[in-house]
Amino acid sequence: MIQSITSQGLVLYNRNFREDDKLVKIFTEQVGKRMFFVKHAGQSKLAPVIQPLVLARFLLRINDDGLSYIEDYHEVMTFPKINSDLFVMAYATYVAALADASLQDNQQDAPLFAFLQKTLELMEAGLDYQVLTNIFEIQILTRFGISLNFNECVFCHRVGQAFDFSFKYGACLCPEHYHEDKRRCHLNPNIPYLLNQFQAIDFETLETISLKPGIKQELRQFMDQLYEEYVGIHLKSKKFIDSLADWGQLLKEEKK
């Protein structure tokens, strides 16, 4: 079945196909993720809008049994500030790849599309891209079938405690129940507290967010542990972020 639709869409990536053609993966608001064929991409009027992290309203010809086609576009947003900063772009690429990994092709998920779009808009507006990524990661865990409770102790259900996390129980422990898991994570209590807050944050009302570098580093390390334990995906974009830690500081110092 072939149908024509108009939908908001975010380009996830493109890849070469034959000599001058491209296959373009777009996450659309109306019909989920689809692969689109662009013939003679280098000379095509579509060339400016088939680059990664371009958001536009596309006129699309959808083929449920094969490749789909882009017929036209308007209302283009290119996120210039994201694309001008290697570090922000790396994190933006990662959250887009994470959304891609969490959703099957051809499966509509308008709330996820809106969440990803808003995340990129807040990065573009200058909010802390590392913290935005942490919030995106913790909220998208449910798309992978993972539900974690950072609000209460798994044993006594008390709230507002100096919690630690236990992979043994997949939940938090209060100080009175630390002994239940000798291999508990020994987290800074601020980490479970922040993740509990992050699970409830609504990006539509978020105006500012700021955390100290040390806390952000601890969050990053624990999020990596959570994803390794419960999700088990290894995205190239995440590996690139990890590599930035090795040489990224040198680039920042050169800009001073």
UniProtKB/Swiss-Prot annotation:
One of its GO terms (cellular component) is bacterial nucleoid. Keywords: DNA damage, DNA recombination, DNA repair. SUPFAM superfamilies: ArfGap/RecO-like zinc finger, Nucleic acid-binding proteins. GO terms for biological process: DNA recombination; double-strand break repair. It holds the Pfam family RecO_C. InterPro entries: ARFGAP/RecO, DNA_rep/recomb_RecO_N, NA-bd_OB-fold, RecO, RecO_C. Involved in DNA repair and RecF pathway recombination. Belongs to the RecO family. This is DNA repair protein RecO.
